[in-house]
UniProtKB/Swiss-Prot annotation:
Protein name: mRNA decay activator protein ZFP36L2-A
Residue ranges with Low complexity bias: 328-347
Encoding gene (name): zfp36l2-A
Residue numbers spanned by region Disordered: 308-349
A GO cellular-component term linked to this record: cytoplasm
Keywords: Cytoplasm, Developmental protein, Metal-binding, Nucleus, Repeat, Ribonucleoprotein, RNA-binding, Zinc, Zinc-finger
Residue runs in coiled coils: none
Subcellular location: Nucleus; Cytoplasm
GO molecular function, a single term: zinc ion binding
Short sequence motif named RNA-binding, residue ranges: 131-136
Free-text function comment from the UniProt entry: Zinc-finger RNA-binding protein that destabilizes several cytoplasmic AU-rich element (ARE)-containing mRNA transcripts by promoting their poly(A) tail removal or deadenylation, and hence provide a mechanism for attenuating protein synthesis. Acts as a 3'-untranslated region (UTR) ARE mRNA-binding adapter protein to communicate signaling events to the mRNA decay machinery.
Length: 363
C-alpha cells in the first residue's frame, strides 16, 4: 500500500513539474510573439508556439523540448529535471541573445549613421552656399581670431571676400513693410529699398539713346551728328530756303519788266504783285513743314490772248503800270475765284481781295 501511495505522489509531482515547464514555454512563446517573427502553423497551441523568431537557437531548443508530451515524461525523474533546466536555460539564452543582437544592430546602425553625418558635413563644407564668404567675419575683424578657423562661413579679410550675385530686381522696389510701419525685420539684408541711397537702377530702365534721323526735312542725308539738335528745339530751326513759288513770282516780275507787251493776259502791276508775293511766301513756309510737293504752290491756268479773252474789260491802270491798256485780264487763280464763263454777272463777295479793284462791265 505504501509503495502504491508513493508512486501516486511521485506521479503527481512529475505532472506538476511538467505543467510548470509548459507554462514557462508558453510565457516564452508570448514574449516571442511580441518580437519580430514569422507565424508557424501548429495543431497544439500548448506544445508549439504561435510565432517563432528567425535565426534563433533558443526556439529550436524549445521545439525540441516541447516535442515530448507530458504522458511520455513519467519514465525518469532526471529526464524531467533536465528538461525543465533546459527550458529555463533556453529562455535565458534566448533573451540574452536577443539583447546582444539588438545591441549590436543598434550599435552598427548608429555608427553607420554617424559616419554618414560626418560625410555630409564634409560635403556641406565643400559645397558652399550662395552667401559663402560674402560678408566679413565680425569676431575676426574685432579680435583678429575666429574659433571656427578655416571652416568659418564668413570672410577673414578682403582677399577672401566674394561678390554676391543678386537678383536683377534687387533694390529696385520700395519695401512696403518699412514704408508702412517704419520697421523691417530683415534690416540691411532686405531685398527692397529702405532709403534713397539703396536705390539701384533696374536693368533695361536706363535712358534710351536719342534717335538720330538719317534724313533732314529737305530730304538730303545728314553727314554730321552735330545737326541733330536742330530737330529737338523748334526755336533752332533755320528759315526755309526759297521755294519754287517765290522764284516764280520773281521770274514773273522780270518777265513784265523785260517784255511789257508780251502776249499774255496776266499783266500785274507793282501793287498787285506786292499782294501776291506774301501769299506765295506764306504758302511756301507752310509747305516747308509738310511733305515737299513737286508742283509749285501757285499754279496758273494757261494764258489766253487778247482776242480770245472774255468780255471783261481791264480797269485803268496807274501811270507807272507796265501793262498794256488794250489787254484784257483773263484766267483765274487755282482757287477759282474768277471763272472763264460767258456770264457777265458775278458775285463780288466771292472774289479775292487782289481782284477787288476790278470792275465788271458789259460789252
Amino acid at each position: 500500500m505504501s509503495a502504491t501511495l508513493l508512486s501516486a505522489f511521485y506521479d503527481i509531482d512529475l505532472l506538476y513539474k511538467n505543467e510548470k515547464a509548459l507554462n514557462n514555454l508558453a510565457l516564452s512563446t508570448m514574449l516571442d510573439k511580441k518580437a519580430v517573427g514569422s507565424p508557424v502553423s501548429s495543431t497544439n497551441s500548448n506544445l508549439f508556439p504561435g510565432f517563432l523568431r528567425r535565426h534563433s537557437a533558443s526556439n529550436l531548443q524549445a521545439l525540441s523540448g516541447s516535442t515530448n508530451p507530458a504522458k511520455f515524461c513519467h519514465n525518469n525523474n532526471n529526464n524531467q529535471l533536465n528538461e525543465s533546466a533546459a527550458s529555463s536555460t533556453a529562455l535565458l539564452n534566448r533573451e540574452n541573445k536577443f539583447r546582444d543582437r539588438s545591441f549590436s544592430e543598434n550599435g552598427e546602425r548608429s555608427q553607420h549613421l554617424l559616419h554618414l553625418q560626418q560625410q555630409q558635413q564634409k560635403a556641406g563644407a565643400q559645397v558652399n552656399s550662395t552667401r559663402y564668404k560674402t560678408e566679413l567675419c565680425r569676431p575676426f575683424e574685432e579680435s583678429g581670431a575666429c574659433k571656427y578657423g578655416e571652416k568659418c562661413q564668413f570672410a577673414h579679410g578682403f582677399h577672401e571676400l566674394r561678390s554676391l550675385t543678386r537678383h536683377p530686381k534687387y533694390k529696385t522696389e520700395l519695401c512696403r513693410t518699412f514704408h508702412t510701419i517704419g520697421f523691417c525685420p530683415y534690416g540691411p539684408r532686405c531685398h527692397f529699398i529702405h532709403n534713397a541711397e539703396e536705390r539701384r537702377q533696374a536693368p533695361g530702365a536706363g535712358e534710351r539713346p536719342k534717335l538720330h534721323h538719317s534724313l533732314s526735312f529737305s530730304g538730303f542725308p545728314n553727314h554730321s551728328l552735330d545737326s541733330a539738335p536742330l530737330l529737338e528745339s523748334p526755336t533752332s530751326r533755320t528759315p526755309p530756303p526759297q521755294s519754287s513759288g517765290s522764284l516764280y513770282c520773281q521770274e514773273l516780275l522780270q518777265l513784265n519788266n523785260n517784255n511789257p507787251c508780251a502776249n499774255n493776259a496776266f499783266t500785274f502791276s507793282g501793287q498787285e504783285l506786292g499782294l501776291i508775293t506774301p501769299l506765295a511766301i506764306h504758302t511756301q513756309n507752310s509747305s516747308y513743314f509738310r511733305q515737299p510737293s513737286s508742283s509749285p504752290p501757285l499754279s496758273f491756268q494757261p494764258l489766253r490772248k487778247v482776242s480770245e479773252s472774255p468780255v471783261f474789260d481791264a480797269p485803268p491802270s496807274p501811270p507807272d503800270s507796265l501793262s498794256d491798256r488794250d489787254s484784257y485780264l483773263s484766267g483765274s487763280l487755282s482757287s477759282g475765284s474768277l471763272s472763264g464763263s460767258d456770264s457777265p454777272t458775278l458775285d463780288s463777295n466771292r472774289r479775292l481781295p487782289i481782284f477787288s479793284r476790278l470792275s465788271i462791265s458789259d460789252d
